[in-house]
């Protein structure tokens, strides 16, 4: 089936221009996206294909996204990761479906403009597709002001975009010994949003690049020791714990 005119125009216009701007060899050699290329991507909606227009997005059909990703992926693994993750495993889609109004209004416009670069922290040394085996832990507690927070300890690896990300969607198993959330002592696995550099994240460390299958795209480990986040950083709010 043919794409709608506006989607075909994006494929024939900005996508082709992006591939002309970026030097595939230099991207592979340096493992870095030049500032002008990143700005072009942000200005032209490459990070916004999974976000509704009301939040500054540029929603695309599944067919169009597939065509765009296939073309970009045929040129560069780094460019591919920068397009694919924000429009699939990034925070945008699940926030759009399940986020609170406050989360949508705060995160989605920044994701659409590339101010937040997302990654999804699931894979661990002993857990990947078997997500139920993850060992990342979050302990629910009240701070000195009585605010409910989580203390997170985790070791993730092979996380695509981790070396360049500043917004982590972290899969973690919660323990609530005082039943502060009202869901028992073991609420289970949830996803918590962590902003790099936010107060309480001093124990967050993003390591060097991995090189999966020899490709030089941003992929690396994330380690957290006593990282503190508020309970409202659960994607979708505390009811999704």
Language model: regions and residue ranges:
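Amphipathic, small/basic residue-rich leader segments at the start of a protein or domain
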Residues: 1-86, 93, 97-117, 129, ...
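Short helix/loop capping segments that flank catalytic or ligand/cofactor-binding pockets
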Residues: 58-60, 106, 128-131, 160-162, ...
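Short, solvent-exposed loop/turn segments at the edges of secondary structure
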Residues: 86-90, 115, 131-133, 163-167, ...
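Beta-sandwich/jelly-roll carbohydrate-recognition scaffolds of carbohydrate-active enzymes
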Residues: 106-110, 122-141, 157-158, 177-179
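Short Pro/Gly-enriched beta-strand edge/turn motifs at strand-loop
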Residues: 116-122, 151, 202-207
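Short Gly/Pro-enriched turn/cap motifs at secondary-structure boundaries
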Residues: 126-129, 158-163, 182-183, 211-219
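A short core secondary-structure module
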Residues: 147-204
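A glycine-rich, basic-preceded beta-loop-alpha segment at the flavin cofactor/substrate interface
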Residues: 200, 205-207, 221-241
């Amino acid at each position: 089936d043919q794409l709608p005119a506006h989607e075909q125009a994006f494929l024939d216009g900005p996508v082709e221009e992006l591939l002309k701007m970026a030097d595939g060899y230099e991207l592979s050699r340096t493992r870095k996206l030049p500032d002008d290329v990143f700005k072009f991507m942000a200005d032209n909606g490459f990070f916004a294909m999974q976000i509704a227009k009301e939040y500054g997005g540029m929603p695309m059909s599944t067919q169009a996204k597939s065509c765009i990703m296939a073309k970009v992926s045929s040129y560069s693994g780094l460019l591919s990761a920068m397009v694919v993750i924000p429009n699939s495993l990034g925070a945008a889609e699940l926030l759009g479906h399940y986020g609170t109004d406050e989360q949508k209004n705060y995160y989605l416009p920044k994701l659409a403009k590339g101010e937040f670069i997302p990654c999804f922290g699931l894979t661990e040394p002993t857990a990947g597709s078997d997500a139920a085996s993850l060992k990342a832990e979050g302990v629910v507690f009240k701070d000195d002001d009585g605010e409910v927070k989580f203390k997170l300890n985790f070791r993730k690896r092979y996380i695509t975009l981790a070396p360049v990300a500043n917004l982590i969607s972290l899969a973690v198993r919660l323990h609530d010994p005082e039943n502060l959330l009202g869901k028992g002592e073991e609420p289970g696995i949830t996803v918590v949003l962590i902003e790099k550099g936010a107060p309480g994240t001093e124990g967050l460390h993003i390591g060097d690049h991995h090189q999966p299958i020899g490709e030089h795209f941003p992929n690396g480990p994330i380690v957290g020791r006593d990282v503190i986040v508020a309970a409202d950083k659960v994607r979708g709010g505390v009811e999704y714990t």
